């Protein structure tokens, strides 16, 4: 029987059909090669938008800088970055007037956080530009390197462990005439292999001391490294994103803390909340506009898009905002917060790896590093690249480009949201003093604008007024990419609104399936994704049940763990059949051991091991959950783990899932090839760092774990803790006298060794 597909939708309200419009199957595009071209595009575009500004030269670094602030008022619709200081301050003042005490309270909250934040806050985050090695590193390693070099240069305020004290060191480091750093380098030499008698290249890693003068150090401290943004769908061209170094990160963190605190108090802000909470907050604004548009009034909504948001924002404007927001606060606080925008006004963009050339005829490949672009002959490049390099040359110093205007992606999301909301806030009737008025939603560069007016002319006038007001603060609404609709239907941050936010379940499709971490985590993540979608995305019970069955099937094929009584032959089936036959209670076997699936949509919240524990044979329990099982590189797992899931649109989301440590929670071994490269030294540092932290947490289990306060070192803290624990255990009879004596002896030996060192 043929089914007419339109029949499927007869009973479905049209907004529910959105999941059928899903365009993103298959893998998203990833970038290969260097990001140098994309970074040059960003730098050149940013300068083009501000070209009528004033040029100055930075006295410390010699970098040419363009300042578009208070530049000419725009005469056309081209995007421009000429924000007017007095307009921004006016918008800030009005924001405060309509939300009494908002800045004051946020400053107090932030001040408290500033005084309590530990320097290890900076270990969060992924790749960070490491100024000591002049390339990207994991955040923890980059921080450790920075602190190590600060200390060897006599900057020791950071030893208190407070972030604010580390930032004092950063400030002092910028005044020093020179900084001595340790860098890694590698030597290659050809040697004969004893076994095979062939010639092989042997690499050795060395560390060498290097002195940076004030200018070179400042350039590195102000550098943002650039990479290409990966996995971006729906774009023909890739684009560059920035990773700042450790000197900038701490200051940015405090500014964003203040801005976040303000955003939380603004009903039009889509940050910092997410998910259902965000939907509820936004639905409120829409409801307000719809109830206030009386029968006589029209209400329209613009699904907005801004042209090159980051490249038209300006750090100098952010400095003005912060100066205003903190105007009644203590001097030290104002200084700390004003440093981030000042550093961004003087930032340098590192151009990345440079260009790769290959000659097909001679089979030669050579890399032109970014440092050489300043004076290489341009005849080797194509026309497009020639233009780029020509344009950027006046800005180059040591392979980095001076980039004073613009913000680079993802740096001040919260603060730029405050600026956006302050313009939405100017739409109140008492401010427009006309028949039209507006309100809306803002989340970083994304916005939705709701305009109410008695007639269509009024709506048009309101939109025009909003457009021009935005221009005055460097926000450029794109007339081509924004569209207007009767209020009740619009899109904002990939949420589609039609008489309420519509669940777009298809967006979550890419996160269904087997993640490929290990058997234990994958099972847990798989069922958690289904559970979360039932809660948040209108995934109905029948569909969920089907998703679950498909997931189990997928899982069994991935790990070749078909049921023990199946006919399917795989590499594992022989062992699994044997296990099946000798198991009394077959229902107790995990799916990954060839057992049956006991999940249904009612028990998705229970980890599989717990679900089947009572059904397991005793010896199976003993093998499965035995930390002493020698065949398992066993990893201790907190009761909750975090997985990264990829929705179709927007950033990768972190998702919590329950983790029960079993013999299936293995971790794959690291690739050996890294051990022969220049990364090896770093890898060893990282492992050392990891081991120390793990050891420390052994002594301070999370329940009693308070960060060590004061100046006692990690070792001293652990020794004193060991002594206290030993005494308690001895007095309660948990350990014998000999064991107690031995522990005390070890503690004394450690202290003795420290004194000698």
From Swiss-Prot:
The keyword Nucleotide-binding applies. The keyword Transferase applies. Residues 286-483 form the RdRp catalytic domain. Gene3D superfamilies: 6.10.140.720. Its EC number is 2.7.7.48. GO terms for molecular function: nucleotide binding; RNA binding; RNA-directed RNA polymerase activity. GO terms for cellular component: host cell cytoplasm; host cell nucleus. One of its GO terms (biological process) is DNA-templated transcription. Residues 55-64 have a biased composition (Polar residues). InterPro entries: RNA-dir_pol_NSvirus, RNA_pol_PB1_influenza. It comes from the Viruses. Phosphorylated by host PRKCA. Keywords: Eukaryotic host gene expression shutoff by virus, Eukaryotic host transcription shutoff by virus, Host cytoplasm, Host gene expression shutoff by virus, Host nucleus, Host-virus interaction, Inhibition of host RNA polymerase II by virus, Nucleotide-binding, Nucleotidyltransferase, Phosphoprotein, RNA-directed RNA polymerase, Transferase, Viral RNA replication, Viral transcription. It holds the Pfam family Flu_PB1. It is an enzyme of class 2 (transferase). It is found in: Host nucleus; Host cytoplasm. It catalyses: RNA(n) + a ribonucleoside 5'-triphosphate = RNA(n+1) + diphosphate. Residues 52-82 are annotated as: Disordered. A motif (Nuclear localization signal) lies at residues 187-195, 203-216. Residues 249-256 are annotated as: Promoter-binding site. RNA-dependent RNA polymerase which is responsible for replication and transcription of virus RNA segments. The transcription of viral mRNAs occurs by a unique mechanism called cap-snatching. 5' methylated caps of cellular mRNAs are cleaved after 10-13 nucleotides by PA. In turn, these short capped RNAs are used as primers by PB1 for transcription of viral mRNAs. During virus replication, PB1 initiates RNA synthesis and copy vRNA into complementary RNA (cRNA) which in turn serves as a template for the production of more vRNAs. Influenza RNA polymerase is composed of three subunits: PB1, PB2 and PA. Interacts (via N-terminus) with PA (via C-terminus). Interacts (via C-terminus) with PB2 (via N-terminus); this interaction is essential for transcription initiation. Belongs to the influenza viruses polymerase PB1 family. This is RNA-directed RNA polymerase catalytic subunit. It comes from Influenza A virus (strain A/Chicken/Hong Kong/YU22/2002 H5N1 genotype Z). The lineage of its organism: Viruses, Riboviria, Orthornavirae, Negarnaviricota, Polyploviricotina.
């Amino acid at each position: 029987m043929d089914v007419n597909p339109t029949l499927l939708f007869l009973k479905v309200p049209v907004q529910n059909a959105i999941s059928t419009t899903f365009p993103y199957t298959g893998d998203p595009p990833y970038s290969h090669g260097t990001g140098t071209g994309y970074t040059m595009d960003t730098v050149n575009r940013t300068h083009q938008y501000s070209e009528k500004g004033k040029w100055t030269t930075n006295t410390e670094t010699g970098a040419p800088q363009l300042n578009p602030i208070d530049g000419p008022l725009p005469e056309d619709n081209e995007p421009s970055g000429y924000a007017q200081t007095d307009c921004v301050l006016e918008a800030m003042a009005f924001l405060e007037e309509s939300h009494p005490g908002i800045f004051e309270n946020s400053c107090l909250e932030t001040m408290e956080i500033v005084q309590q934040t530990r320097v290890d806050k900076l270990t969060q985050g992924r790749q960070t530009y490491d100024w000591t090695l002049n390339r990207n590193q994991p955040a923890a390693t980059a921080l450790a390197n920075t602190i190590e070099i600060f200390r060897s240069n006599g900057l020791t305020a950071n030893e208190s462990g407070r972030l604010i004290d580390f930032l004092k060191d950063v400030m002092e480091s910028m005044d020093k005439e020179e900084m001595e750093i340790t860098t890694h380098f590698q030597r290659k030499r050809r040697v004969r292999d004893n076994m095979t008698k062939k010639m092989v290249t042997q690499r050795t890693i060395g560390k060498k001391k290097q002195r940076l003068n004030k200018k070179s150090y400042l350039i590195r401290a102000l550098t943002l490294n650039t990479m290409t943004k990966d996995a971006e769908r729906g774009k023909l061209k890739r684009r560059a994103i920035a990773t700042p170094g450790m000197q900038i990160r701490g200051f940015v963190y405090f500014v964003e803390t203040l801005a976040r605190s303000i955003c939380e108090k603004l009903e039009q802000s889509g940050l910092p909340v997410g998910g259902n909470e965000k939907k509820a907050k936004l639905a409120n604004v829409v409801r307000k506009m719809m109830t206030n548009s009386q029968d006589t009034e029209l209400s329209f909504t613009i699904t907005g898009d801004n042209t090159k948001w980051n490249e038209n924002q300006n750090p100098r404007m952010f400095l003005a905002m912060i100066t205003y927001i903190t105007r009644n606060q203590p001097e030290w606080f104002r200084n700390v917060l004003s440093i981030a925008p000042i550093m961004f006004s003087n930032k340098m963009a590192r151009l990345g790896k440079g260009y790769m050339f290959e000659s097909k005829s001679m089979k030669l490949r050579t890399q032109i590093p970014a440092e050489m672009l300043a004076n290489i002959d341009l005849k080797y490049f194509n026309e497009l690249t020639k233009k780029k390099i020509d344009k950027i040359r006046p800005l180059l110093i040591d392979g980095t480009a001076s980039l004073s205007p613009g913000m680079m992606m993802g740096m001040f999301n919260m603060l730029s949201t405050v600026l956006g909301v302050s313009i939405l806030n100017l739409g109140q009737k008492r401010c427009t003093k006309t028949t039209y008025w507006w309100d809306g939603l803002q989340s970083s560069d994304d916005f939705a604008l709701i305009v109410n007016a008695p007639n269509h002319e009024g709506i048009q006038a309101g939109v025009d007024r909003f457009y021009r007001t935005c221009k005055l603060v460097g926000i450029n609404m794109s007339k081509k990419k924004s569209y207007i609709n009767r209020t009740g239907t619009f899109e904002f941050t990939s949420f589609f609104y039609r008489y309420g936010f519509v669940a777009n379940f298809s967006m979550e499709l890419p996160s269904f399936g087997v993640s490929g971490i290990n058997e234990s985590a994958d099972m847990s993540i798989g069922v958690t994704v289904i559970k979360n979608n039932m809660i948040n995305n209108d995934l109905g019970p029948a569909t969920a049940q089907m998703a679950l069955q498909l997931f189990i099937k997928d899982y069994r094929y991935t790990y070749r763990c078909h049921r023990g009584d199946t006919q399917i032959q795989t590499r594992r089936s022989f062992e699994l059949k044997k296990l099946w036959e000798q198991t009394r209670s077959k229902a107790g076997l995990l799916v990954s051991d060839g057992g049956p699936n006991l999940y249904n949509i009612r028990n998705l919240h229970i980890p599989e091991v717990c679900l089947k524990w009572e059904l397991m044979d005793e010896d199976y329990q003993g093998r499965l959950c035995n930390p002493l099982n020698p065949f398992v590189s066993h990893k201790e797992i907190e009761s909750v783990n975090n997985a990264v899931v990829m929705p179709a649109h927007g950033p990768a989301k972190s998702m919590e899932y329950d983790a029960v440590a079993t013999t299936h929670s293995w971790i794959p071994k690291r690739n050996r090839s890294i051990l022969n490269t220049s990364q090896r030294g770093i890898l060893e540092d990282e492992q050392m760092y990891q081991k120390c932290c793990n050891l420390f947490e052994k002594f301070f289990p999370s329940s009693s774990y308070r960060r060590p306060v004061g100046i006692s070192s990690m070792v001293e803290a652990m020794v004193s803790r060991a002594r206290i624990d030993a005494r308690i255990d001895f007095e309660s009879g948990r350990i014998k006298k000999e064991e107690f004596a031995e522990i005390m002896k070890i503690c004394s030996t450690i202290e003795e060794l420290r004194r000698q060192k």
